[in-house]
């Protein structure tokens, strides 16, 4: 579904008697993130995802602000008045989900961080690639983030000329919050990690979980791209949580 500016994926088939999960894509990615996610048709709506500005089929420009993306999604969701909605963010998308809940009082049933943690700090080498173009940055992330060999992984990232990846990676680097504030959020938080993910800082995970009440799940033999590397197991875990 589209309006003049924004692409809404699977919103045309929403049944308000079923559970809904809004998925939020990581840096440079879009609605193709959920193409292999399978949830029970009798219990869940199809995976919902909104392309961020400048991503996928949404118009506009990308941003170097997590807060901007959070505000964008909240405004985009307003006409739908969704109830029983959970948030599931991949990588950068996890930070956006945290911001929606913490700084904008968004009411979510569950919050799931997939291959994501706060803080997310980006290597200088990756930022240097992103300053040149989206392709080099995507190749870098795939090289260090992908564990299972997958053909066509590059196609999941932005192919635009605009420096979308640089904006998104800067947004991750720039984002600041207080873990003690998250601790007081009355929404269940789950973290899903890949055992072979080299892009998530395990010390940051340890610090986060020491302060914030949360449940951690680890997927075996999976890197940073669990949505593509093992969508069956990821779908099972999400169904278990929500």
Question: What are the residue ranges of the model-derived segments?
Answer:
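Conserved alpha/beta-hydrolase "nucleophile elbow" surrounding the catalytic nucleophile
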Residues: 25-27, 85, 89-91, 194
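Catalytic histidine-centered segment of alpha/beta-hydrolase-like enzymes
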Residues: 222-235
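Conserved HGGG/HGGXW glycine-rich cap/lid loop of the alpha/beta-hydrolase fold
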Residues: 9-59
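Flexible "cap/lid" loop of the alpha/beta hydrolase fold
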Residues: 95-138
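Conserved alpha/beta-hydrolase "acid-adjacent" motif
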Residues: 198-204
């Amino acid at each position: 579904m589209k309006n003049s500016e924004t692409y809404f994926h699977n919103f045309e088939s929403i049944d308000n008697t079923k559970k809904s999960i809004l998925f939020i894509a990581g840096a440079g990615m879009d609605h193709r993130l959920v193409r292999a996610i399978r949830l029970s048709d009798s219990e869940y709506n199809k995976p919902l995802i909104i392309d961020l500005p400048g991503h996928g089929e949404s118009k506009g420009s990308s941003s170097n602000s997590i807060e901007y993306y959070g505000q964008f999604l909240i405004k985009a969701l307003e006409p739908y008045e969704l109830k029983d909605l959970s948030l599931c963010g991949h990588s950068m998308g996890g930070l956006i989900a945290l911001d929606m809940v913490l700084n904008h009082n968004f009411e979510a049933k569950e919050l799931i961080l997939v291959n994501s943690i706060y803080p997310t700090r980006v290597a200088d080498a990756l930022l240097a690639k992103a300053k040149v173009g989206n392709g080099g940055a995507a190749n870098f992330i795939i090289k260090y983030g992908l564990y299972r060999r997958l053909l066509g992984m590059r196609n999941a990232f932005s192919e635009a000329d605009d420096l979308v990846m640089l904006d998104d990676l800067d947004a991750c680097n720039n984002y600041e919050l207080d873990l003690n504030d998250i601790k007081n959020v009355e929404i269940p938080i789950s973290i899903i990690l890949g055992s072979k993910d080299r892009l998530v800082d395990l010390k940051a995970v340890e610090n986060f979980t020491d302060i914030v009440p949360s449940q951690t799940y680890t997927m075996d033999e999976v890197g940073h791209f669990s949505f593509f590397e093992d969508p069956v197991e990821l779908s099972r875990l999400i169904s278990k949580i929500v």
